[in-house]
Amino acid sequence: MLTYETWEENDVSFSEEDETKGALSVLSWAYKEYENEIVYACSFGVEGMVLLHLINQVNPSAKVVFLDTNVHFQETYELIQKVRERFPSLNIIEKQPKLTLDEQAKLHGNKLWESNPNLCCKIRKILPLEESLANEKAWISGLRREQSETRKHTKFINQDHRFQSIKVCPLIHWTWKEVWRYVYKHSLPYNPLHDIGYPSIGCEKCTLPVGEGGDSRDGRWAGKVKTECGLHYQ
C-alpha cells in the first residue's frame, strides 16, 4: 500500500476518449489500494457533485466528510440533503469543530473570520480534517489545476505534507466548462449560488461573488492576501 511514509511518485494514464480524463481510473485505483481507509473531503461545490457521482459508481458506500464550520450558506446545507436523497448509500459525515461559535468568540473575540481568518480556518476546518484523517491512509479532493496558480501543479496522487497522508485528486485535468457539461448531462444537483456569480463557495462570512473574468478563487477572503483555507498547502 502506498502511504505517506512509503511515498514514491505515481501516475495514472488515460485515453483521449475517456470522458472523465482519468478520474474514474484514479478512483478505481484509490478504492482498491485503500479500501475502507480513504475518505472524500467534500465542500459540496460543483466539482464535488461530479466527484460524488463518479465515486458512487466505484464505491456506493464510500465515506464522505463535510467540514461543517457552522457558518456555511443555507443553500449548501440544503444541497447536502439533496445529495443524500440522490446517493442514499454514500456515508456522508458532517464533521463539527470542537468549539461552537460562542465558545470561539469567548476565547478569540467576535468575528474571528475578520480579525484572524487563518486561525478561524484552523479551528473550524484544518483541525476537524486532521481528526477525520487520523485513521485514514488517504483522502480525496476535488482540486483542479485550472482553479488557481496555487493548484496548477497538482497531480493525481500527491504526498500531502500538511496532513502526512496521500491526497488523491481525480479532477486535475478538468476545465470549468467540462465540470458543468458533466453536471448538466447527468442532471446532478448543485448549489444555486453558482448561478449568481459564486464559482467557489465556502463559508458565508468569507465568500463573495466574482466579477466576469476573475479567478475562480477571487471571491474567497476578498480584500485579503489569503486565498486558501490551509487544507491544500503542500
From Swiss-Prot:
A cellular component annotation (GO) from this entry: cytoplasm
Cofactor note: Binds 1 [4Fe-4S] cluster per subunit.
Localization (cell): Cytoplasm
Main location: cytoplasm
Pathway(s) annotated for this protein in UniProt: Sulfur metabolism; hydrogen sulfide biosynthesis; sulfite from sulfate
GO BP terms, alphabetized: cysteine biosynthetic process; hydrogen sulfide biosynthetic process; sulfate assimilation, phosphoadenylyl sulfate reduction by phosphoadenylyl-sulfate reductase (thioredoxin)
Enzyme nomenclature, EC number: 1.8.4.10
Top enzyme class: oxidoreductase
Coiled coil: none
Swiss-Prot/TrEMBL cofactor(s): [4Fe-4S] cluster
GO terms assigned for molecular function: 4 iron, 4 sulfur cluster binding; adenylyl-sulfate reductase (thioredoxin) activity; metal ion binding; phosphoadenylyl-sulfate reductase (thioredoxin) activity
Catalyses which reaction(s): [thioredoxin]-disulfide + sulfite + AMP + 2 H(+) = adenosine 5'-phosphosulfate + [thioredoxin]-dithiol
Catalytic residues identified in the record: C229
Pfam families xrefs: PAPS_reduct
Record's keyword terms, sorted: Cytoplasm, Iron, Iron-sulfur, Metal-binding, Oxidoreductase
Residue numbers binding [4Fe-4S] cluster: C120, C121, C203, C206
The protein's role, per its UniProt record: Catalyzes the formation of sulfite from adenosine 5'-phosphosulfate (APS) using thioredoxin as an electron donor.
NCBIfam families: APS_reductase, cysH, PRK02090.1
Similarity remark: Belongs to the PAPS reductase family. CysH subfamily.
PANTHER family linked: PHOSPHOADENOSINE PHOSPHOSULFATE REDUCTASE
Protein name: Adenosine 5'-phosphosulfate reductase
Source organism per UniProt: Bacillus cereus (strain AH187)
Lineage of source species: Bacteria, Bacillati, Bacillota, Bacilli, Bacillales
